[in-house]
């Protein structure tokens, strides 16, 4: 599905590790084994690569140098992007207790508030819905954009990262 979405938007796309046989889900591929994507992005000279888990509710990214962009990075990047555009309505990004301390320090430096929940996108969304927050997620790449969904969506996360790249 991701390739169809990106192709429809005019992106040049490559797909790797997309031949499921019923037994090989996430087998040395996807968001839990991102090394192959890192190598592929660098060797092909690509701008970005996106890795999804088996049900595509998680997304991690690889930049042009092969660096992994975790869910914490995505929350920071898109949280700042939203704030710059006046779309971070509560000025709060929702995270879990597993997020890196550096994320909170970076949010503090940008004047962005944050909330910590128990691990699980269920708890992240619960807090978001109760408090009117627009973005939240987990280090693992479950990113929730409450304007569009109540759970993580890897393809949506990819599109949002591309939006920032093209801004």
Describe the residue ranges of each PLM region:
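Phosphate-binding chemistry for phosphorylated carbohydrates and sugar-nucleotides
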Residues: 1-165
